[in-house]
Regions:
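Acidic, metal-coordinating helix/loop segments flanking the phosphotransfer/catalytic sites
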Residues: 33-53
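Alpha4 helix (beta4-alpha4-beta5 surface) of REC/receiver domains from two-component response regulators
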Residues: 88-105, 109
Length: 137
């Protein structure tokens, strides 16, 4: 059983590569992609109980991933939102966490950690007792 995911990413090449790798390595099925804050926020709100994981880039074609993140504050406990950005500074990590991000990953240096986090979430979905370790960034 795959983890049902949404991807907010405006770079088509990055989105394509992430979708393929997430499915292959982590059993994460990306069911929709949005390139703007509006697209992402609307999809996540309209499908509020249908997703397990949202992966959000901070810089989108329109708006911000921080706005998407803020819109997910009232999500179910089982739903996770992670930020994937080229700008994972300490300030961005702090702000994203304050807005409810479960984790923040740097695109240039922490993709393996993102994949490990996603694999852990998939394992926990299949076996709620699995994956007792936590990857906080």
């Amino acid at each position: 059983m795959s983890l049902i995911s949404y991807l907010a990413e405006d770079n088509e090449a990055i989105a394509r590569n992430l979708i393929e790798t997430l499915q292959e390595i982590c059993e994460v099925k990306v069911v929709a992609v949005g390139a703007t804050q509006t697209e992402a926020s609307q999809w996540l709100a309209l499908h509020d109980s249908e997703w397990d994981l949202a992966i959000v880039d901070l810089f989108l074609k329109e708006g911000s991933g921080l706005g998407v993140l803020a819109g997910c504050r009232n999500r179910s406990f089982r739903q996770k939102v992670v930020v994937l950005t080229n700008y994972a500074t300490p300030e961005i990590r702090k702000r994203a966490t304050e807005l409810g991000a479960n984790a923040v990953f740097d695109k240039s240096s922490e993709l393996e950690q993102l994949f490990a986090y996603c694999a852990e979430q998939t394992a926990q979905r299949l076996d709620p007792g699995a994956g007792s370790g936590s990857l906080l960034h």
